[in-house]
Amino acid sequence: MKKIMALILVFALAATMCACDGLEKLEQVELPPLPTVEPSQEPETTPEPEESPEPSPEPAELGNRVIVSIKNNTEIHNAPDNEAQRILTFSYDTPQVHIEGNDAAAAVINDHIALLDELYYTGTGEGGGVNAMLEMALDNYSYFVDTGAEIGLEFSSDRTVKISRADSSVISLVFTTMTYTGGAHGNYFDKGYVYDAQTGELLTLDKLTSDYDAFSGFVQEYMLTLAKEDETYASLELIEDLPSALSALLREGSWYFDENGLVLFSDVYELASYAEGIIRFTIPYTELENVIDEKWLPDERQGGDGSFEVSLQSDVPSGSVEIIDKVTADSEGLELCLKAVGTVYDVSISSVEYADYSHKFFETASHWACSYMNDCAIQLVTLIPEGMPDLMISYTTADGTRQHILISQSGEDGSIIIIDAESVEAVG
């Protein structure tokens, strides 16, 4: 027993010595200071993490502002022996493109438009040209003088331009040429020209995609489906080989982009009668994703809905709003300030007429288009008729809604007002 107790004492002594040695080493280690807590201070508790709200999307970059203004050029020719008798009206619209921050691309486009003007005026392109038209008009008038026949004496050639899309990616123009040289009705045709807004290059169908065969097949199939399922194209059932007739529309000059999508169209008489006119097929942009290159699709838009307000220019203090352009619809009219409140897209200004049979306005002339306006204004010179308004401003809001408004005058106090085109009805 004594031996056992002795052994226990030996082990205990050894453990004590080891512990002392360990304590000496621990004492040499510097420990961080403990936090001091006041007696009255409650310990801080870590709050439960709150769900952070989804970050608001950044507004989409607006890109370079694109403005297209249209100037009309008109020549009037009268009979050589009767200044009161008009025998020819020869006119054409000239679009002028301005791209903020990219004068080089705008110059390329404007040079091509100048070439189109020259071809139309001289008659070396499609159309007779002013000299050929005047010669025909003089021959027609001479026949009338010699025979006294009851014939139409006024010939005409008119080329108008519709701005179907203008943004930082694409500038798309549709030229409509109408000629009348006697007979029951005149003749007309459309021609589409689409430009790359970054370079000014005139686009062709094969430049829309890296896989033209797949693109071509998709477009033909889409048109064929529309023709079979949409009642708008019911008359096309009479065409014997409809697939071949539709595939022929995949050609240069017979397509353009507008706010809705890719449009392909026929010539008059090609698919239907003169009364039915030009047949158009629209393929929405949503259907063109992964079919054409993404850069040709419209940019995604974000932000609140914008709107317009109008006032007399004389009532607007100088320097109170940024004026980006001046648009003259009628040089003898009032000078107005048309201001965008917030951001609006695809702004266009056009002359219109009201059709009683459809209870809608249809465009008679394009004046101006702009890719976007944000808290800025234009000076607008226009007449305001006493009756039905004849000038329409169209624009798209951030959510994609297309709006059409008219400028009119209040019957109560004579102030300049904006009215919704959808709310207008003819009286009487």
Q: What residues fall within each predicted segment?
A:
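The feature marks short-to-medium sequence segments in extracytoplasmic or secretory-pathway proteins
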Residues: 201-234, 339-374
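Compositionally biased intrinsically disordered regions enriched in Thr/Gly
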Residues: 21-35, 54-313
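Extracellular beta-sheet/turn segments enriched in Thr/Pro/Gly and aliphatic residues
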Residues: 311-315, 321-326, 404-428
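Extracellular mucin-like PTS domains
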Residues: 35-57
